[in-house]
Amino acid sequence: MKGPIKSIVLGALLACTLFGAISSLRAQAGRGDWTIRKSEQPGKIIFTLIISDRHNRSNHEVEEPLGDFHGVDLSKPGKQNVEFTLARDAGKFECEGFLHDGEGAGVFHFSANANYPQAMRALGFEGIDSEKQLEMAMIDVSLEFAKEMKAERLEGLDTDKLIAFRIFGVSKVYIEELRSLGLSAADSDKLVAFRIHGVSPEMIRYLQKAGYTPDEDTLVAMRIHGATPEWMDEMKRAGYDHIELQEMIGFRIHGVSPEFITELHELGYKRPEPEQLIAMRIHGVTPEFIKDMRSHGMQDLTIDKLVSLRIQGID
């Protein structure tokens, strides 16, 4: 695994670990607070679990079908006291509190499923202590989800990656769609990086239609640096179509923009080579610099000469 991808995923897993650490503040007691509010999606509600102490606070919000909350009736007007449960494979959230016209709050107690760690261990997922089990219940790491991911034969898949998959949205459907587009989609770290940075099937289809066959590291780098399909369309209109993806990434890193290209065109530089544009940005050859050199009587300046002047310290 290459350095940038590894750093990205380690950061993501650190975020997951931090989530678990914060959750552990009250995990021994398995208690916390909850809120409910209406969702814009018919038949669903937005349910938030809150774990906190004097120093830290951790929220986890999910949008779930109303039918998953046994004991909640949103059809009743006014204020009502409620007791309901939300069952997960990892355990059950037993909640009590109040609702008022479809919104409410209260406290919960988490009852861990004693069989869950053993069932997960049988699938190859180790290290599930009480804190991690609460976290896995909150984000709904089900046995079925674990089986689905194991069946995909992914490299580096462990309990923490499984948690990261649920947090960032790596699913069986997502993996299979990537594979249908020709990617191996076999590395757990890269799949997490894909979701963090927004590598989508739509983006891959756009690139393939444009004649590219990007590898997974290039896709992540494009998203990190903002080489989006929309930006690539702008570059195409500026006259830069079908250039290498690494050059596109270089454009974004060094600030080669459609506006920069237009200004150069107005100064007589019709279509500089991609590597020339990058060199100009690296060394600070700006339209203003070109105009200044011309005002001092320097004419017929090629791009290579301009770059050389800047390297020599002429400003």
Regions found by a protein language model. Name each.
Residues K2-S7, G11, F19-D315:
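General marker for long, soluble alpha-helical cores
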